[in-house]
């Protein structure tokens, strides 16, 4: 799998190393309509409906699911990103799934599932 960014890679490794997570699935790799996990959203800039593929889907050990998106700090407030987030939140709520959008800086500073600071020795190259 080719990660889009270091924070996305760090997020993935935090999820697979966590004892709270049973499995993690890549969803973004199915961007050529090969997978079923996508979110339709209204793009306020183009006025069109598009498909959005979140980064990961995690099955937690408590039986719940999390749909996960990692965004750079400079993009997280973008109107299109927010439109994707709103559509994903609506779809996730209707499906009983929790949607998480993480800022890259948050992932690099915090063990997101543990709410603990990341130690410099644990950062990925």
Model-assigned labels for residue ranges:
Residues 1-125:
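Electrostatic, structured charged patches in enzyme active sites and in nucleic-acid/phosphate-binding
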């Amino acid at each position: 799998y080719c990660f889009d960014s270091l924070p996305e890679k760090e997020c993935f490794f935090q999820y697979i190393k966590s004892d709270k997570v049973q499995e993690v699935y890549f969803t973004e790799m199915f961007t050529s309509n090969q997978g079923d996990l996508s979110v339709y959203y209204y793009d306020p800039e183009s006025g069109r409906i598009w498909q959005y593929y979140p980064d990961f889907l995690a099955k937690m050990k408590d039986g719940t699911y999390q749909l996960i998106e990692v965004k750079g700090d400079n993009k997280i407030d973008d109107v299109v990103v927010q439109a994707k987030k709103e559509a994903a939140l609506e779809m996730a709520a209707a499906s009983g799934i929790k949607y998480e959008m993480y800022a890259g800086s948050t992932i690099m500073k915090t063990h997101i599932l543990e709410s603990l600071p990341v130690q410099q020795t644990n950062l990925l190259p």
